[in-house]
Amino acid sequence: MVLAELIGKVRTDYKILTRSLLTGVNQIDQFMIPVPFDHEENALQKSLEMRRRAMEHLENGGVIVLFPSGKVASSETMFGKVVEGDWNPFTAKLIQKSGADVLPVFFPGSNSRIYQIANQISATLRQGLLIYEVVHAMNKPQKPLIGNIIKQDEISSWKSDPRGFMKWLREKTIKLGSNG
């Protein structure tokens, strides 16, 4: 939501790829494209529709906001360090096929330890706490760190290696956090 507010100050032609759990709110629904969970009914069809809508929006000159790992950064154990997951090659395909430039944004911090523990216990508990975490974060000052735009000239050099591109972009984005 913080990112939506920042983008909305500059442009209104953005869409956020987000879990369907966080969509359906009338005031913001026009800015959302739902990403289905794997276990949802018709997940494959919904996923293909999500990809089609995202690509169409980019082809029309719009902005797509996404979280490339497809999940919230979390710890691998109840009390472990929070880690950003590997980034999905779908993101590379979306960027490369659309010809879009990329603006990396890093959000410092992480969800609460209770969320991290819930993540180890139950997907349902984790999802329930995610809504709490979003609401809780909205009531605190956020300081996203914004990198430089990465142009297609640089992106195109990764065309034959989408996984390498995602690894490089992930490291570049996370590094914003150590420089901030």
Question: Predicted segment positions?
Answer:
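Non-catalytic C-terminal accessory region of glycerolipid acyltransferases
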Residues: 44-180
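Catalytic core of membrane glycerolipid acyltransferases/transacylases, capturing the structured
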Residues: 1-43
